[in-house]
Amino acid sequence: MDKTAKKILIVEDDQFLRDFYQELLTAEGYQIDVAPDGDIALEKLSQGGWDLVLLDIMLPKKDGLQILQDIKTTPPKSAIGPIVVLTNLGHDTVINKAFVLGAGGYLVKSALNPDEVLKEVKSFLQKS
């Protein structure tokens, strides 16, 4: 594995989407890890060192907004890059709350295609 590859954490409970993101981003040379629920996500996030986090809002155990709040309250051991919220909820209130809690951006899952995902990931990584 390339030690210079950017590290991305995918927090998504839907197995199909998790596999989709993982395969797509691994093929581009990114180092990927996954978390299927909020508790596992917080455990992995607490270690820090992520260049980018793709965080679903609707998760079992702890939702994405709770995770953002926990990170804000108790920062990770080392820095993490932007947190991009993944949601089917295009509601302004949910998105605004995510930004208030520290999200760096959002993607509406229903509008995504592979090229768009790669474009957005590259854009967020360049900003970090």
Name each model feature, range by range.
Residues 56, 87:
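Active-site residues of response regulator receiver
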Residues 34-52:
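Acidic, metal-coordinating helix/loop segments flanking the phosphotransfer/catalytic sites
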Residues 60, 91:
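The feature encodes the CheY-like receiver
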Residues 64, 99-105:
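As written
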Residues 15-33:
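Two-component/phosphorelay signaling modules centered on CheY-like receiver
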Residues 37, 63-69:
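Acidic catalytic/metal-coordinating carboxylates
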